[in-house]
Design a protein with these regions (language model features):
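ALDH superfamily catalytic-core signature
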Residues: 65, 71-231
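Intrinsic structural disorder
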Residues: 1, 50, 130, 232-233
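Rossmann-like NAD(P) dinucleotide-binding subdomain of oxidoreductase/dehydrogenase enzymes
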Residues: 1-109
Length: 233
């Protein structure tokens, strides 16, 4: 949705294809644009699954450019479709972005930024810092600080102003996260904290905000894994 602003500023019309699991926020954005006086037909919204909605858009000859943020598999399909009509593309695809920490870094700032980079929006950001590479002389101290602070991250719903991290987008997403953690453990990495679904017991304890009610949300504890190598899945 953030790409709407640059598209309009450059004088373009647009078709916004929102993720199928989060259509309502895009609907609210479109309503706000209409209220601000955006002419009919300049901004357009389509909702639904990528195969049914996004795929035809990337193939349509009247679409001049496709900007996509998401997974590598989908990105390859879009690039292939776009090539048929020589569309321009801007593809921000999935990756494991590293934060590199040197021994002369401002320690507290580095810890805070590493945690924010990893757990902002519960890690559901294409630029999330899901890997941390630490200079060996600083490793133990840095990891200990990460674990200590991760254990204090407040978990809560989207309307809880004290919450520092929120729910995952779906139960399937949580199952995928849990499977990755299990695989890391099986392949020799160490799960230093987290590594399971969050419960009301957690939010009534050190992860609580005092007002946390998980309700029907899908949550996973902030998790720190140590000892991962390039050879691991």
């Amino acid at each position: 949705s953030w790409k709407v602003g640059p598209a309009l500023a450059a004088g373009n019309t647009f078709v916004l294809k929102q993720a199928e699991l989060t259509p309502h926020t895009a609907m609210l954005l479109m309503a706000a644009l209409k209220e601000c006086g955006l002419p009919d037909g300049v901004g357009n919204l389509i909702t639904g699954a990528g195969a049914n909605c996004g795929n035809p858009l990337s193939q349509h000859p009247d679409v001049d450019m496709v900007s996509f943020t998401g997974g590598l598999v989908t990105g390859k399909i879009i690039a292939k479709n776009a090539a048929e009509t020589v569309k321009r593309t801007a593809l921000e695809l999935g990756g494991k972005n590293p934060n590199v920490i040197f021994a002369d870094a401002d320690f507290d700032v580095a810890v805070d930024n590493a945690l924010n980079g990893a757990f902002f929006h519960s890690g559901q950001v294409c630029s999330a810092g899901s890997r941390i590479i630490v200079e060996e002389s600083l490793h133990d101290k840095f990891v200990d600080a990460l674990v200590e602070r991760a254990n204090k991250i407040k978990i809560g719903g989207p309307t809880d102003e004290k919450a520092e991290t929120g729910p995952l987008i779906s139960a399937e997403h949580r199952e995928k996260d849990a499977a990755y953690v299990d695989k890391a453990r099986e392949q020799g990495a160490k799960i230093l904290t987290g590594g399971r679904a969050a419960t009301s017991e957690d939010t009534n304890g050190q992860h609580g905000t005092g007002t946390s009610d998980l309700g029907a949300g899908v949550y996973y504890l902030p998790t720190i894994i140590d000892g991962a190598t390039r050879e691991m899945d």
